[in-house]
Curated annotation (Swiss-Prot):
This is Gamma-aminobutyraldehyde dehydrogenase. It comes from the Bacteria. GO terms for molecular function: aminobutyraldehyde dehydrogenase (NAD+) activity; NAD binding. SUPFAM superfamilies: ALDH-like.
Length: 474
């Protein structure tokens, strides 16, 4: 198993404190890995700085070829990546193989093509006797912090656009789920020039803070919690670094009385509980119009209770464990707080399961009120609440009454209503009669405290560039 760091093109052991990496399905230690030391962090950043002078001037074609080679290598090692991700995260193995690995490969291939298609305003004489042109140049050294819910996927979302744009990257995966990023480092070592991509390991307080605060780091990209985002923004503010933040969500799922309730129930069963609900776009905050509320509660209860929990390697498993014991405790506390409210009905689930591993039963909580914490706060687990509403104006207010602004969905057969709501919902994405659908060509990113900046799409590529104006007098 690959456990070494990648610094300046060389795989090396960490020199810092050793940290245990767990299998959440069993609670057992997989292995221990030594963190990067401050000297190693500095060496990784300095390697990126030194290489940037050359890598930043390479042609888009050359960078694209490297990304395509990495995509091919991931595809060729798909089963090994999937097994590592499943073991380290508790994800059902078949979900990683069939859903995540193909999407990861596609992200690298998309940005390989996008690198060769950056656009800008037409050059011209906007001032007589002077010709102006626009350049999109790489920023420099990017520090990327990836989360624990989709370790390899989020690494791909960060690495592909940054490298395609000509930046050099130092990435730190979560200390909870580092195995696939470290495996990726071993493949990248033989594809990219030394220093272009560096992979570290360690906790936020010991490695992340040193990395993001390094004076030579020009940009910080984070996918994580609001608290982590706020910490990094405060930490990097004195240096005025470029930042790119995706900080979670609490997606409203608005169901009108003309919606296809079977489709809604099946959709929430899939989109609310994929990856054990550990997804910032999860369909977790349901609003149902009064006329269909009881019927939808019944259908959702039947759908959610039919989800099969089990071992990640079992092909029939739909729901795996949560990622860590600490997170299991957070989810349990959130549900217990909701259950203590007299108006909340537990339709199914509501507690962790017996036995080994960090499993929490798929949970549906009915009759939640707008002000309830279960409606307002991100639980990030297999927990869905449902709230009754009366009319379009009310549900629009409630849908937008959130500090989050990442994703939302509207379920209705009324095209006009769908357009009205999608235009007014304060979310980076609104799906109509579906949820959770992501493609490399379209942007993913939020508003409000869900952060700013886009992943995927040409907009994501542009986020890792500097717009510059060149004027020539003649």
């Amino acid at each position: 198993m690959q456990y070494q760091l990648l610094i300046n093109g060389v795989l090396v052991d960490g020199e810092g404190e050793r940290q245990s990496v767990y299998n959440p399905a069993t609670g057992e230690v997989i292995l221990e890995i030594a963190e990067a030391s401050p000297a190693q962090i500095d060496a990784a950043v300095q390697a990126a700085v030194n290489t940037f002078a050359e890598w930043g001037q390479t042609t888009p074609k050359a960078r694209a070829e490297c990304l395509l080679k990495l995509a091919d290598s991931i595809e060729q090692n798909a089963l090994e990546f999937a097994r590592l991700e499943s073991q380290n995260c508790g994800k059902p193995l078949h979900c990683v193989i069939n859903d995540e690995i193909p999407a990861i490969v596609d992200v690298f291939r998309f940005f390989a093509g996008a690198a060769r298609c950056l656009s800008g305003l037409a050059a011209g004489e906007y001032l007589e006797g002077h010709t102006s042109m626009i350049r999109r140049d790489p920023i420099g050294v990017v520090a990327s912090i990836a989360p624990w819910n989709y370790p390899l996927m989020m690494a791909a979302w960060k690495l592909a656009p940054a490298l395609a744009a000509g930046n050099c990257v130092v990435i730190k995966p979560s200390e909870i789920t580092p195995l696939t990023a470290l495996k990726l480092a071993a493949l990248a070592k033989d594809i990219f020039p030394p220093g272009v991509l560096n992979v570290l390991f360690g906790r936020g307080q010991t490695v992340g803070d040193v990395l993001t605060g390094h004076e030579k780091v020009r940009m910080v990209s984070l996918t994580g919690s609001i608290a982590t985002g706020e910490h990094i923004l405060r930490h990097t503010a004195p240096a005025i670094k470029r930042t790119h933040m995706e900080l979670g969500g609490k997606a409203p799922v608005i169901v009108f009385d003309d919606a296809d309730l079977d489709a809604v129930a099946q959709g929430v069963r899939t989109f609310g509980f994929y990856n054990a609900g550990q997804d910032c776009t999860a369909a977790c905050r349901i609003y149902a119009q009064r006329g269909i509320y009881d019927a939808l509660v019944e259908k959702l209860g039947n759908a959610v209770s039919s989800l099969k929990m089990g071992a990640p390697e079992d092909e029939s498993t739909e729901l795996g464990p949560l990622s860590s014991l600490a997170h299991l405790k957070r989810v349990t506390a959130a549900v217990e707080e909701a259950k203590a409210l007299s108006h909340i009905r537990v339709i199914t689930g509501g507690s962790q399961t017996e036995g080994k591993g960090y499993y929490f039963a798929p949970t549906l909580l009915a009759d939640a009120k707008q002000e309830d914490a279960i409606v307002q706060r991100e639980v990030f687990g297999p927990v869905v609440s449902i709230t009754v509403f009366d009319d379009e104006d009310q549900v629009l207010r409630w849908g937008n009454d959130s500090r989050y602004g990442l994703a939302s969905s509207v379920w209705t057969q009324d095209v006009g209503r769908a357009h009205r709501l999608s235009a007014r919902l304060q979310y980076g994405c609104t799906w109509i009669n579906t949820h959770f659908m992501l493609v490399s060509e379209m942007p993913h990113g939020g508003q409000k405290q869900s952060g700013y900046g886009k992943d995927m799409s040409l907009y994501g590529l542009e986020d890792y560039t500097l717009v510059r104006h060149i004027m020539v007098k003649h």
